[in-house]
Amino acid sequence: MENFLLALNVVLPIFFIMTLGFLLKKIKMADEHSLNIMNKLVFRVFMSTLLFLNVYNIGDLSALSMDNLKLLGYAFIIILVVLFIAWLIYMPKVKDKRKLSVLIQGVYRGNFVLFGLAIVDSIYGKEGLATVSLLTIVVIPTFNVLAVIILEYYSGREISKLKLLKQVIKNPLIIATLLGIIFIILKINIPKPIYKTLSDISKIATPLAFIVLGAELEFGNMVKNIKYLISANILRLIGNPLITVGVGKLVGFQGIELVALLSMSACPTAVASYTMAKEMNADGDLAGEIVATTSMLSIFTIFCWVLMLKNLEWI
């Protein structure tokens, strides 16, 4: 019963906030224009500030233990493994390259910052957030760099290495991560008033992002892509965490480390994947539908994963 309640405590706040967003859209307190603006604010300002502070709060990279480095190395490798498996599955069957890139991205690229922080905070509190913040140093740049490469490669346009580099460098989450690392390496201390301001701004990120995500959920036009959506949801919400957490346990990770890996792999497809797909000539409609369906279904699957791992005493 205790494990059941813990799992509920993880997913219910996410569900309630997303439901609020959905209702606000229905009663016309938010429209497409305002949601687009809020989405940009979340992505470029609030989420980036949150990510910067989480990295900055690590404090000292020289204090990283071998276990920390092992976790970072594993996260990087397993992302590549999941991406390769998704490519092997979809490459022979999906002839439309614009859909192929979106499906691959939908499987490996999760909404790690948003859902990951919420999941780990619910289970382990600040102690767990330190581990997730550490993972962001590797996970966020890897997610985004690979997304730019895949979407550009399958866009049907001539590939420019300079354009690829620009797409990577301009990503707000990558910039925030790198800034956090630079502040740590140079031992730059942020004055208390500025830190307090940044901290207050960062607290807006998670609830507002969930409100926007809930408001943007649309299920009316998904029939034409139903077979792609079913496979993407199974691979994203079941296959990815099964591989990532299962192999992670075999490698020797446990407790907070496994929860961090679960939050990386079991969360829904990143909201930014929709924006990036539209900007890079991929199938934006399919990308948005994958984000919407995985976001809704993940409420149930994350609950099941947390409950199962708790009962197995892995976390």
Regions found by a protein language model. Name each.
Residues 1-315:
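Alpha-helical transmembrane segments of multi-pass small-molecule/ion transporters
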